[in-house]
């Protein structure tokens, strides 16, 4: 299951990179039209923080301190910086999953979060994180086409 999850995360983070590259200009990455809560740039920052924390730090032991409020507050980060961040987190996720002992999938995830089952396994949470990535990837795609 780990190789499949790794490949899916890498594939869809590459799709996120392609979406960011497809915006017509820098300003549109950060545009928030009426009825839309988050820009494509905000969603990219959020996914970078989310995966850096829950995969890179929690499972891979990478030194990372997440600033979730900043993920939603920062604006006008250059598109090249966003793309570099997505590529970095893709490599981080791939490397972490490559090194993860398959037995860890059935162990409780190191971070237990409110609203999730008590004793949530790493397998459960990785599947959740992949769904979360895809939810926001779809939002970025819609946001880009809406503009």
Label the model's feature ranges.
Residues 74-110, 124-133:
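Acidic/histidine-rich alpha-helical segments that form the ligand environment
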Residues 6-10, 14, 26-70, 111-147:
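Short, contiguous alpha-helical
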Residues 1-6, 79-80:
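Active-site rim elements
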Residues 13, 19-22:
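N-terminal first-folded block
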Residues 20, 51, 90-97, 137:
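A structural signal for well-ordered alpha-helices, especially hydrophobic packing surfaces
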Residues 22-29, 96-107, 145-147:
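Surface-exposed helix-capping loop/turn segments at secondary-structure junctions
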